[in-house]
């Protein structure tokens, strides 16, 4: 499917940016020192996404394949785990470490730690603000120039809160990408090809006694501009990324993102909307759909809107797959099976 490379490149860029903010300089040192401790604190599993049974490695009939949409969603989930889980685990570890130490100063009710000069020698300094109100741990992460002396000299990179109420863990955080651009030394060589703007708001809730979990990622004027050696690509979104699992193990996934999907020559430089949806049963059987849509007459898809539908068994192998008629001449052998084998109808999809 032509969208795979383009979608992954945009999400990987986001992941790298999110990770470098929490795993750089002195903050990496602090997170390593802070590992372990309070079992009631937020943990990686609280925000980790997964398909029903993951992608199994069992040997099978060579004719068995996983669908394009299934593979894209699986890779998107893995990319998202990298920076969402990394952000939460990193911030939780930093909170544990600093919460047991005397603050550098105070700012109202906030305890302020730093600014600390970056351990890697870059022109960066890091500052953390913590507060605890009735069991809700609030945090802010700031970054500024290496000679920063106070809160006034740094910019907010991330803020959020974490809480635990018996078996229910919840929280959220905001990641401000404009701050990354204001301090480009946070970027590594690969990131230097990307320009970020806007913010992402992540919220999550998990019942540790069941399989119920929900994770929402709201894009707010979020944009990634990739400036490559051969061409440029832009990806942006004001939509929401949703992941749900219920008590019985059933679940759903939804993501919408605008971008340029021209890797296979089925689209030109215009921007279209990609929509990915999936739903699955407690047994892990399910249905997925991938669409690339022209919006308000904008787009240059070769044959208009693209629509791929799939059904799969619990290990992700497809039982049915179809592409809309407008594109079947491009891939005449694409359609497989009959829709009657699907355990879920299209109405089960969240989009």
Predicted region positions:
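Bacterial N-terminal signal peptides that target proteins for export
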Residues: 2-12
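Hydrophobic helical h-region of N-terminal Sec-dependent signal peptides
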Residues: 12-16, 20
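C-terminal motif of bacterial Sec signal peptides marking the signal peptidase cleavage site
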Residues: 22-25
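N-terminal "mature head" segments of proteins
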Residues: 27-135, 308-351
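Short N-terminal edge-element motif at the start of the domain
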Residues: 93-195
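Acidic surface patches and DE-rich sequence motifs
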Residues: 105, 117-119, 133, 145-149, ...
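Short helix-loop boundary/capping segments
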Residues: 155-277
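Extended, charged low-complexity segments
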Residues: 248-250, 254-351
């Amino acid at each position: 499917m032509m969208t795979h490379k383009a979608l992954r490149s945009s999400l990987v860029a986001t992941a790298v940016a999110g990770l470098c903010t929490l795993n750089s300089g002195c903050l990496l040192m602090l997170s390593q020192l802070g590992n372990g401790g309070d079992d009631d604190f937020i943990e990686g599993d609280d925000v980790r996404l997964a398909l029903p049974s993951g992608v199994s490695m069992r040997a099978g009939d060579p004719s068995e394949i996983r669908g394009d949409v299934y593979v894209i969603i699986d890779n998107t989930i893995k990319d998202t785990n990298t920076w969402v889980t990394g952000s939460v685990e990193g911030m939780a570890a930093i909170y544990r470490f600093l919460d047991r130490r005397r603050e550098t100063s105070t700012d109202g009710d906030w305890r302020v730690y730093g600014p600390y000069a970056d351990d890697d020698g870059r022109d960066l300094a890091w500052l953390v603000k913590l507060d605890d109100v009735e069991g809700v741990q609030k945090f802010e992460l700031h970054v500024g120039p290496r000679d920063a002396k106070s809160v006034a000299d740094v910019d907010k990179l991330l803020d959020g809160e974490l809480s635990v109420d018996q078996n229910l863990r919840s929280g959220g955080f905001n990641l401000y990408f404009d701050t990354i651009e204001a301090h480009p030394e946070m970027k590594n060589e690969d990131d230097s090809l990307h320009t970020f703007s806007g913010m992402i708001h992540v919220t999550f809730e998990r019942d540790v006694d069941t399989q119920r979990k929900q994770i929402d990622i709201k894009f707010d004027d979020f944009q990634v501009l990739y400036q490559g050696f051969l061409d440029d690509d832009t990806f942006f979104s004001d939509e929401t990324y949703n992941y749900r699992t219920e008590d019985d193990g059933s679940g759903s996934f939804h993501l919408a993102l605008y971008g340029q999907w021209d890797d296979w020559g089925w689209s030109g430089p215009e921007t279209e909307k990609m929509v990915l949806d999936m739903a699955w049963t407690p047994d892990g059987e399910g249905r997925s759909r991938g669409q690339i849509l022209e919006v308000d007459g904008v787009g240059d898809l070769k044959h208009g809107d693209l629509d791929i539908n799939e059904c799969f068994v619990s290990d992700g192998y497809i039982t049915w797959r179809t592409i809309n008629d407008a594109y079947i001449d491009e891939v005449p052998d694409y359609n497989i099976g009959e829709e009657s084998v699907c355990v879920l109808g299209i109405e089960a999809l969240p989009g």
